[in-house]
């Protein structure tokens, strides 16, 4: 209660201490990069998870999804998380770092802590588990952090019952400028970590880390927007995605628990001060410069896997959100298939809303043999479609199968995309 009252008092007292100068205007389309989830496993479909997704197109934080503070952490001194430094506008979630006019002492964790810098934190109200998570963000050009991460409590029962553990999954952490300090490399590229926080039966605490994943880049994270993504695949592994780069993969630390990352975590977007002297503290000049002191989150998006044929009807979809260039594709130009009364055809599609895929099978002379319709539920799907035939087809020349993705009850005239595959029948 003392801690909550102290934070509230600080927010009220300091909310008006800072002059609000208009920052440089950024466009959410400054640079196009790869975005959206990777190809899903066979038989699965990525769908948007709205509880952890936000385009930040309003004028205030969506309090049905987010807290404007960290519920259990007030910040790493000398940086204090303050709700006054969180805002939404111009299509962005903004976090503004500032120098406090005077030192502020907060009594927390059984001691007095001195703060002189204002930072910010936005935390999801719900916890989540496996899925793909990404954000598009431009870092502040300071030594304060720009982060996209998840964590749990540290009080889950361990394998010995008397021990405890917690989880932290850092998709990305960075700063926005370089300097003469060891952590200067955090100002460029992407840096991903996974922590297994462990307390043994004697109360000794350990930070067990998986090998760090890095993507190198010549440009600073504050020069432009970047897309950072992470696929929490299962209890043991994750994959990371940086702009248009191929993914890199990580195996979680598993010497205490064979499947360590088995608990839900909360999403956290944080602008904090890092440990000094590993990273230099931000100076007053950069903290007073509106062109440098603000983090811009363009959007955060989360996806979960469902079965291909799951309508996902319990989730309300936003028809204005165009996540994909809608398409249907086959994995190759030709396939071989054993002669049968059905054809099993691998394909994938991306659809912003429920669509249908029209299949037409032709013989070598262009004669239409079979037509069929597949309902393509919204999302990114990878599947094997079974085309039922009236009879076994003769061997010989290849057959052509065309696929058109279109609106429900549509026709060829309003086709959104089409693909073709040639099928060679074998005995």
From Swiss-Prot:
It is an enzyme of class 3 (hydrolase). It is found in: Periplasm. Residues 32-308 form the GH16 domain. This is Beta-porphyranase D. Keywords: Glycosidase, Hydrolase, Periplasm, Signal. Its EC number is 3.2.1.178. It catalyses: Hydrolysis of beta-D-galactopyranose-(1->4)-alpha-L-galactopyranose-6-sulfate linkages in porphyran. It comes from Zobellia galactanivorans (strain DSM 12802 / CCUG 47099 / CIP 106680 / NCIMB 13871 / Dsij). Residues 1-19 form the signal peptide.
């Amino acid at each position: 209660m003392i801690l909550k009252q102290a934070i509230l008092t600080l927010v009220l007292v300091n909310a008006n201490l800072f002059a609000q100068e208009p920052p440089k205007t950024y466009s959410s389309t400054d640079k196009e990069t790869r975005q959206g989830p990777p190809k899903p496993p066979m038989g699965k479909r990525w769908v948007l998870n709205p509880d952890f997704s936000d385009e930040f197109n309003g004028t205030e934080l969506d309090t049905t999804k987010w807290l404007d503070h960290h519920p259990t952490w007030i910040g790493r001194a000398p940086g204090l998380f303050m709700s006054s430094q969180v805002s939404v506008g111009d299509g962005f979630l903004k976090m503004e770092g500032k120098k406090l006019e005077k030192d502020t002492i907060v009594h927390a964790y059984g001691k007095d802590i001195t703060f002189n810098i204002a930072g910010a934190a936005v935390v999801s109200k719900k916890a989540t588990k496996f899925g793909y998570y990404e954000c598009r963000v431009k870092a502040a050009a300071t030594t304060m952090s720009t982060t996209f991460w998840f964590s749990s409590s540290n009080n889950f029962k361990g394998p010995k019952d008397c021990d405890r553990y917690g989880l932290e999954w850092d998709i990305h952490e960075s700063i926005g400028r370089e300097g003469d300090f060891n952590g200067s490399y955090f100002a460029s590229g992407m840096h991903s970590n996974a922590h297994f926080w462990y307390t043994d039966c004697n109360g000794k605490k350990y930070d067990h880390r998986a090998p760090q994943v890095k993507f190198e880049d010549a440009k600073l994270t504050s020069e432009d927007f970047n897309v950072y993504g992470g696929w929490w695949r299962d209890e043991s592994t994750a994959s990371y995605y940086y702009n248009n780069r191929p993914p890199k993969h990580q195996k979680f630390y598993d010497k205490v628990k064979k499947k360590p990352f088995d608990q839900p975590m909360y999403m956290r977007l944080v602008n904090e001060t890092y440990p000094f002297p590993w990273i230099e503290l931000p100076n007053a000049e950069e903290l007073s410069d509106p062109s440098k002191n603000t983090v811009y989150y363009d959007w955060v998006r989360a996806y979960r896997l469902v079965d291909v044929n799951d309508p996902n009807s319990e989730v309300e979809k936003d028809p204005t959100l165009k996540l994909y260039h809608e398409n249907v594709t086959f994995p190759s130009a030709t396939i071989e298939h054993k002669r049968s009364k059905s054809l099993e055809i691998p394909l994938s599609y991306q659809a912003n809303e429920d669509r249908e895929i029209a299949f037409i099978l032709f013989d070598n002379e262009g004669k239409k043999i079979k037509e069929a319709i597949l309902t393509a539920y919204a999302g990114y799907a990878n599947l094997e479609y079974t085309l039922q035939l009236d009879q076994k087809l003769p061997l010989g020349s290849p057959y052509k199968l065309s696929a058109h993705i279109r609106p429900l009850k549509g026709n060829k005239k309003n086709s959104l995309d089409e693909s073709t595959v040639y099928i060679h029948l074998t005995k």
